[in-house]
Regions:
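Alpha-helical transmembrane segments and immediately membrane-proximal extracytoplasmic
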Residues: 1-251
């Protein structure tokens, strides 16, 4: 199924939300606002890194990838062993077994490293980092709500996943059904939809297009600039002028 394809095995650890109280609506809207703001910040950061990488290094793709690999290697070497296994890290966050310190550090680390990897020019996807970032945000916010109020919001991890995907991709309905595919529980659709729609609206206040549409726009602009440069260096072709006969020559 989809959950096994993208690396999440959460059905056994997930406890479904039996009741949906009015207080859940308030907390989920607040989560959607926070996630929507950070999703737009993440989108702009990734696009800026891609734009700057192309501007600084141009067509020197090997140099870009080498420097990014060295920096990423140094970052991961300095991190604890928990961060060396992305699958285990995603499992800890998805199952709600990570504490707030691990969730926050995971968000910061993955936020920074994903932008750096995108700036390297190497092919790679953004979907899996979105899920992990959203889950880390949801776990952090859920733990904060529990610490401050004593109320335990059981779906914040999945609500954060769906909301972050919706904020970056501008697809709240798809994010909702993605969360359903991960959990196979219909009870999660309502809280996921609330958080995803809120994140979608907040992110659209800053820019109407998704991260993928803006990436395509950057690629088209780059191709147009390259075509203009090539046309500028080309010499215009003019056909040779035939020799003119002297005016006095009547033959």
């Amino acid at each position: 199924g989809l959950s096994s394809t993208i690396g999440f095995q959460l059905e056994r650890q997930y406890t479904p939300l039996v009741r949906f109280l009015p207080i859940d609506l308030i907390y989920l809207i607040a989560l959607g606002v926070v996630v929507g703001l950070l999703a737009e910040l993440y989108t702009r950061y990734v696009l800026t890194m891609q734009r700057q990488g192309s501007r600084w290094f141009g067509d020197r793709l090997i140099l870009r990838m080498t420097l990014s690999g060295v920096v990423l290697g140094c970052v991961y070497a300095a991190l604890p062993d928990t961060f060396h296994n992305p699958s285990e890290l995603k499992h800890l966050i998805g199952a709600g077994e990570a504490d707030i310190g691990l969730a926050l550090s995971s968000f910061v680390m993955l936020f920074f490293c994903t932008g750096l990897a995108a700036g390297s020019g190497a092919p790679g996807g953004l979907f899996m980092p979105m899920l992990t970032l959203g889950g880390a945000l949801g776990l952090t916010c859920g733990t904060g709500v529990e610490s401050l109020t004593g109320y335990v919001p059981t779906t914040y991890v999945f609500a954060g996943m769906g909301a972050f995907v919706a904020g970056c991709s501008r697809t709240p309905i798809s994010a909702m059904f993605l969360a359903f595919a991960l959990t196979k529980d219909l009870l999660i659709l309502k809280p996921i939809l609330v958080a995803s729609l809120t994140s979608f609206v907040v992110a659209r206040l800053f820019h109407p297009h998704s991260i993928y549409e803006r990436q395509m726009g950057m690629e088209l602009d780059s191709e147009e600039r390259m075509e203009k440069q090539l046309n500028r260096h080309r010499r215009p072709f003019s056909p040779p002028t035939p020799p003119q006969s002297p005016k006095g020559d009547l033959s």
